[in-house]
Amino acid sequence: MHNDKDFDQWNEEKKVLHADAERLFFHEREIWYCHLGNNIGFEQDGRGELFLRPVVIIRKFNNEIFWCVPLTRTLKDLPFYFAFAMHVDTETSNEQSAAVLSQIRLIDAKRLRRLVGYISEKDFALLKKKLKALLP
């Protein structure tokens, strides 16, 4: 079996993240670049040297942990994908994105890198409704 993922590089980055005492302040509905890392099988990976991927924060439990859903630019018409216009806090007003609902994860705030934007209240309500529909 061919394995082209660099788990060793991700492990080194994870050690740095773990040792970092800083946790950034975040809110539900925000979209952040997050160090998701190199993962197993079909789990969503981060990209680049820092293993980053945008995520939308679904549920904040406290200042340390939250549920998030990874985002992709690949739009698929499947029940576990939710397409929406991401509102970016920079010069770009809207960017099409899709939340991969089946990949919901509990994340420590140490993994957060940079605030990118947010999802509208209307789209956030629809996203949560679609997430709940996936439960048995």
Label every PLM stretch briefly.
Residues 1-11, 16, 24, 85-136:
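C-terminal terminal-subdomain/extension
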Residues 35-36, 70, 102-103:
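Pocket-edge structural micro-motifs
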